[in-house]
Amino acid sequence: GLLQTITEKLKEFAGGLVTGVQS
């Protein structure tokens, strides 16, 4: 559903932020 899609996008976004901070 739409909520699941949004959740997945938020996970990807958060993962990108974490990777950016760590590098």
UniProtKB/Swiss-Prot annotation:
Tissue: Expressed by the skin dorsal glands.
InterPro entries, per the entry: Aromatic-AA_hydroxylase_C
Keyword Secreted recorded: yes
Record carries keyword Nucleus: no
Gene Ontology MF: a single term: oxidoreductase activity, acting on paired donors, with incorporation or reduction of molecular oxygen, reduced pteridine as one donor, and incorporation of one atom of oxygen
A GO CC term assigned to this protein in UniProt: extracellular region
GO BP term, pick one: defense response
Keywords: Amphibian defense peptide, Secreted
Compartments (UniProt record): Secreted
Main location: secreted
Protein's job: Has no antimicrobial or anticancer activity.
Family listed: Belongs to the frog skin active peptide (FSAP) family. Aurein subfamily.
Protein name: Aurein-4.3
Source species taxonomy: Eukaryota, Metazoa, Chordata, Craniata, Vertebrata
